[in-house]
Amino acid sequence: MEAARKGIITPELEIVAKKERMTTEELLPLVASGKVAICANKNHKCIDPEGVGSMLRTKINVNLGVSRDCKDYDVEMQKVMEAVNMGAHAIMDLSSHGNTIPFRRKLTSECPAMIGTVPVYDSVIHYQRDLDTLTAKDFIDVV
């Protein structure tokens, strides 16, 4: 958004414009005004940038993650890659058990789709406490 407000056409904006069958001149003001977000986190090593918002195609999201009942990170990564191969644009990691950090690192290094998480779940895992005992500061510290 910052670059768009300065009139700078980034490589990510060019990619999204092409995917959306728009010109960069059409997309730039949508990003600058906040009507479109380009999801391209610098820590996500292999992301294929996507645009989300007004005037753009609907994106496909897949929810998955490890839990007490399904603890196998390799199985979850297989699901991730199958979802991407089937056209998913976004993966929502709903992991609610164990050490999620290695799984997230694997996601951001191997999965080209946008990735989302649930900070509330991360807080419960990090502090190993019940949700009703966590404070606003606990949530912010985890994020």
Question: Where are the language model's segments positioned?
Answer:
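Alpha/beta enzyme core
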Residues: 2-143
